[in-house]
A protein has these predicted regions:
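A short, active-site helix/loop in glycosyltransferases that binds the activated sugar's phosphate group
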Residues: 139-179, 221
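Acceptor-binding helix/loop patch of EC 2.4 sugar-transfer enzymes
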Residues: 39-47, 105-144, 285
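A charged, aromatic-enriched C-terminal amphipathic alpha-helix characteristic of glycosyltransferases
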Residues: 320-352
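Acidic donor-binding loop of glycosyltransferase active sites
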Residues: 252-265, 278
């Protein structure tokens, strides 16, 4: 098949692309590298860096002209409903729908469907500390109404919606186009497993990115309390907004990753960390695991509560001799559930039913 993947979140489309290529398919990735993360892509969505009239051309005119010429793909998959600027997004997507065989939406971010499920009380707590995201979909504002309108039109255009986790499946539960959850893909050939040895102090790391959504306030509070009470046993690193290569360097020296505490499920950062043999503290609920046919995971579940996180940090300190084996179990879990070759096959099966 000839496949176009449009947009990127934390290497999700990169790893899916690599799995699909391993299956013998022709895949092209269009993205701007997920912003400051600078992730690889075959072609940019739009050029950045210029100002004035040139910026208007780069941001609006050129991509509209170029993507109208993207034709003849068997599958065009969007990583979110709004990949381009709001002024041209739906114009481009209508052209992609017209000029290619099938148009698919990957549900991998907190779009209007997820916000609606939260407002209706179906999803709990995920935006309790991230009210800024809710404002983007405020129906009392013109900007919010236009954003909702544009997303709804994209949903009308796509042939299939593929959720990557429980909350996105719940968000689209009333949409007949939604498929079963397909787990996140990881290219294990590119993510090296290294024994998680504790050399001196246990190193704990929390990466700063979308702090309100991830619950950084609670994670930071617990980590600082741990450092205060166990100064000779632990090192804590709280840093962020790093290019992916720099982020991976920090991961290399870390024993335990604290990712997020205000969700139902773990994401790409947690998956990559587990694949590298790290102990991961994150969200991992029974509902989310059930959606990917798993009864348990090696993820240590945490919630938006400083005391809860702190107690689990102390438990790890008291089990430092088990950290290496815990990291090994993390890797084995990713090999079983998230191998990009297995995930690529699941996407091919979903697309094949169109």
């Amino acid at each position: 098949m000839r496949i176009a993947l449009i947009g990127e979140f934390s290497l999700l489309h990169n790893y899916l692309k690599e799995g699909l290529i391993n299956k013998g398919h022709n895949v092209t990735l269009f993205s701007n590298g997920d912003g400051w993360k600078k992730m690889p892509s075959d072609y940019k969505l739009y050029n950045t860096g210029r100002k004035g009239i040139k910026r208007i051309y780069d941001f609006y005119i050129e991509p509209l002209y170029r993507f109208k010429k993207i034709k003849g793909y068997d599958i065009v998959q969007l990583i979110s409903p709004l990949v381009f600027s709001s002024f041209i997004n739906n114009k481009i997507i209508r052209a992609l729908k017209k000029n290619n065989k099938h148009l698919v939406l990957m549900a991998a971010g907190n779009d209007y469907a997820t916000v609606t499920a939260y407002k209706e009380g179906i999803l709990k707590h995920i935006f309790d500390y991230d009210k800024e995201h809710l404002i983007k979909y405020d129906e009392k504002t013109l900007k919010g109404r236009l954003k909702i309108r544009d997303e709804k039109e994209v949903l009308d255009l796509v042939d299939l919606v593929i959720p990557t986790s429980y909350i996105y499946k719940v968000g689209y539960k009333n949409n007949p186009k939604v498929s079963n959850v397909i787990p996140l893909p990881i290219n294990l050939a590119k993510v090296e497993y290294i024994q998680n040895k504790v050399i001196d102090k246990i190193v704990f790391f929390h990466g700063l990115n979308r702090e309100l959504a991830k619950g950084t306030f609670f994670i930071r509070g617990a980590m600082e309390k741990l450092k205060e009470n166990y100064p000779n046993d632990v090192e804590i690193i709280i840093d962020g907004h790093l290019p992916y290569d720099e982020y991976i360097k920090i991961i290399g020296k870390t024993n335990v990753i604290l990712d997020q505490c205000c969700d139902y499920d773990y994401g790409m950062n947690a998956c990559v960390s587990m694949a590298r043999g790290k102990v991961v503290m994150c969200c991992s609920t029974k509902e989310a695991l059930k959606e990917i046919d798993q009864e348990s995971s090696p993820v240590i579940p945490i919630s938006a509560n400083i005391d809860d996180i702190y107690e689990k940090l102390v438990s790890i300190v008291n089990k430092r001799n088990e950290i290496e084996n815990m990291g090994f179990q993390s890797r084995k879990y990713v090999e079983k559930v998230h191998d990009c070759n297995i995930i690529a096959e699941k996407y091919l099966e979903a697309w094949g039913r169109l």
